[in-house]
Amino acid sequence: MSFTVLVPARLASTRLPNKPLADIAGLPMVVRVARRASQSGAARVVVAGDDAAIVEACARHGVEAILTRQDHPSGSDRLAEACEQLGLDGSDIIVNVQGDEPLIDPALIDAVASALAAHPEAAMSTAAHEIDSLDDFLNPNVVKAVLDAQGNALYFSRAPIPWWRDGSANGAPPSVLPAPAPLRHIGIYGYRAGFVRSFPSLAPAPVEATEALEQLRALWHGHRIAVHVSHVAPGPGVDTPADLERVRAVFAADPAR
């Protein structure tokens, strides 16, 4: 199985300006992400940046990068342009690794690519992990996933699903986790390049805007999303200055990462 990793990177960030170029132990964050991705089985790792500064930073460190438009409304649109620029065949598998995940597990990248390859009927693949904290289950920033018997996604939500009716009283939030353990969605996606190109032309789903979850567009239009359930908790991403300091501390303690 051959696949390509695409790393979309956008310079503007409300909470952390110039995030892709933030220094982590002497390297820009987006370069850290690309280097982690290159430890997977990917045949190619390409950063899709929206600013020449990103492309130049990657070039200085031997990372392949392309310049994409700045006016894309979503990451999916940026991926579609990247697929066109790279001339990828419609059947080619790509894995979208977020540019703010410098601790991404290379094995998780391989698993997401394999999940799509093993499910030819699926348009996308992604990953999930068991939730072991009630606080996480109730946290709207932790996206939950519910799967069918074949491991395909039924729904993603910021709400605590599945709702444990017998574990709550009078509609109040449950005091313990439901069993079996609910699943936390991990924001990594596998696609076939042809689907990436067509995705931006799909009408946005009403629930997509309500939940602010773009993957719901695929489900709303009847496409299957195969889900790999990982038994390894995902590494922390970087959204805020505090997140950045935590990740810097990890690399400072383990420079060989």
Swiss-Prot record:
Mainly resides where?
cytoplasm
Q: Which Gene3D superfamilies match?
A: Spore Coat Polysaccharide Biosynthesis Protein SpsA, Chain A (3.90.550.10)
Named in its record, the pathway it takes part in is: Nucleotide-sugar biosynthesis; CMP-3-deoxy-D-manno-octulosonate biosynthesis; CMP-3-deoxy-D-manno-octulosonate from 3-deoxy-D-manno-octulosonate and CTP: step 1/1; Bacterial outer membrane biogenesis; lipopolysaccharide biosynthesis
Q: Name one GO molecular function term.
A: 3-deoxy-manno-octulosonate cytidylyltransferase activity
Q: Which GO terms describe its biological process?
A: CMP-keto-3-deoxy-D-manno-octulosonic acid biosynthetic process; lipopolysaccharide biosynthetic process
Q: Which family does it belong to?
A: Belongs to the KdsB family.
HAMAP family, sorted: KdsB
Report the protein name in the record: 3-deoxy-manno-octulosonate cytidylyltransferase
**Gene of this entry:** kdsB
